[in-house]
Amino acid sequence: MYAIVKTGGKQYKVAEGDLVKVEKIEGEPGASVALTPVLLVDGADVTTAADKLASVSVNTEIVEHTKGPKIKILKYKNKTGYKKRQGHRQKLTVLKVTGIK
């Protein structure tokens, strides 16, 4: 059984027991988080009806907070000697899916 959930502006396909890296969610490691909205559930049959999915949630547990890979940004203007370097690391949360109900 799997589900497709939307969090942090992205969609993730999850199944029970999966570890998923998502945009940062506030909470301490070990805390439980319910992910909604659920866009699709596949069990005995595929469910995409909004009225049936309103009662479905994906229960997860926060495993850890981490950072993604460093992204390097360089602004450069020709002939003027203007250069600006910048770096960024996105904050992520690792979730473990404990159940789809």
UniProtKB/Swiss-Prot annotation:
Provide a Gene Ontology MF annotation, just one.
rRNA binding
Free-text function comment from the UniProt entry: This protein binds to 23S rRNA in the presence of protein L20.
By what name is this protein known? Large ribosomal subunit protein bL21
Q: Which PANTHER family match?
A: 50S RIBOSOMAL PROTEIN L21 (PTHR21349), LARGE RIBOSOMAL SUBUNIT PROTEIN BL21M (PTHR21349:SF0)
Q: Which Pfam families match?
A: Ribosomal_L21p
Identify the taxonomic lineage of the organism of origin. Answer: Bacteria, Bacillati, Actinomycetota, Actinomycetes, Mycobacteriales
Family indicated by similarity: Belongs to the bacterial ribosomal protein bL21 family.
Gene Ontology BP annotations: translation
Q: Which gene encodes it?
A: rplU
Subunit comment:
Part of the 50S ribosomal subunit. Contacts protein L20.
Q: Mind telling me which GO cellular component terms the entry cites?
A: cytoplasm; ribonucleoprotein complex; ribosome
Q: Which domain of life is it from?
A: Bacteria
Could you list this entry's UniProt keywords, alphabetically sorted. Ribonucleoprotein, Ribosomal protein, RNA-binding, rRNA-binding
Q: Does the keyword rRNA-binding apply?
A: yes
